[in-house]
């Protein structure tokens, strides 16, 4: 085996814990794409061919013992080789804390370790208008979701057939993306070339609407209804709570991608639990890394 080739080990699934792969590979591209925000691309044919929109990986820097645990990062993009075969994945992160500070100093050729794909994926039921709502770094899982929904690309071809994404299930995909200032907006060119329409809000008015991303969502929800609608949301918890309330007000299904801190990513440590309302009206703790990170918005105990 070429010493620069990824090393991959597949972990056996059980009734309680999912199948995932441990991959030791190298960074092929690492660049800053917004203020305090980086996009890292790593080579892995297996992860690129199996991962669905909304799923994530635990990431570690090889040989780094401080911090020891990995960091959960969602797939931002999937890349193909010259033959059109999935060959690499990208993650996006903001520099916040010791791990991401060290990670941001890594360069192409440095070794990293990933295990995944982890968690569930966004629903793929046919819909006329899919509205993506992202705040902060919450845009990360939205690019592949938009691509899959519009049928521009399929994902998870090597995953079990029941889990792979269908070839297009939305007629229109809108992105509502909010940030503090325009300097924090990441991946805009990719979203503008993928989504049907992109709507921007910045708190200081430096780009797009001056205000909150929920203002943009309200405007879209007030458009004359043309068929079915669904919302997918990721970002700070107060924003997702507000989006959940709007979805309820407009009787629109909404899925949220939770960003709870986690240590293992495979359901063992229970550090990522969230309060989820059960069918009987009571709540119970659910692991974001196993039962999530995607949940129906109305099932989350926001208070």
Language-model segments: residues:
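Short, charged beta-turn/beta-strand-edge "cap" motif at the junction between a beta-strand
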Residues: 62-66, 116-121, 278
């Amino acid at each position: 085996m070429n010493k620069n080739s990824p090393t991959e080990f597949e972990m056996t699934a059980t009734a309680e814990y999912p199948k995932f792969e441990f991959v030791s590979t190298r960074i092929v591209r690492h660049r800053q794409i917004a203020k305090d925000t980086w996009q890292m691309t790593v080579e892995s044919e297996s992860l690129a061919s199996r991962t669905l929109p909304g799923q994530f990986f635990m990431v570690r820097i090889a040989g780094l013992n401080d911090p020891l645990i990995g960091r959960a990062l969602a797939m931002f993009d999937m890349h193909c080789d010259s033959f059109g075969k999935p060959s690499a994945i990208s993650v996006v992160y903001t520099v916040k804390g010791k791990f991401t500070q060290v990670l941001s100093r890594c360069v192409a050729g440095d070794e990293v370790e990933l295990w995944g794909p982890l968690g569930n994926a966004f629903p793929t039921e046919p819909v006329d208008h899919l509205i993506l709502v992202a705040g902060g770094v919450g845009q990360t899982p939205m690019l592949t979701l938009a691509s899959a929904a519009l049928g521009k690309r399929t994902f998870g071809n090597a995953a079990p057939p029941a889990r792979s994404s269908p070839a297009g299930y939305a007629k229109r995909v809108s992105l509502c993306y909010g940030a503090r200032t325009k300097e924090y907006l990441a991946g805009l060119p990719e979203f503008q070339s993928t989504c049907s329409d992109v709507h921007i809000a910045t708190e200081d008015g430096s780009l797009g609407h001056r205000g909150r991303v929920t203002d943009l969502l309200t405007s879209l929800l007030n458009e004359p209804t043309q068929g079915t609608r669904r919302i997918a949301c990721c970002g700070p918890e107060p924003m997702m709570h507000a989006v959940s309330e709007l979805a309820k007000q407009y009787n629109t299904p909404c899925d949220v991608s939770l960003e709870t801190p986690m240590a293992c990513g495979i359901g063992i440590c229970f550090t990522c639990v969230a309060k989820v309302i059960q069918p009987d009206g009571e709540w119970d703790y659910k692991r974001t890394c196993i039962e999530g990170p995607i949940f129906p918005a109305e099932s989350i105990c926001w208070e």
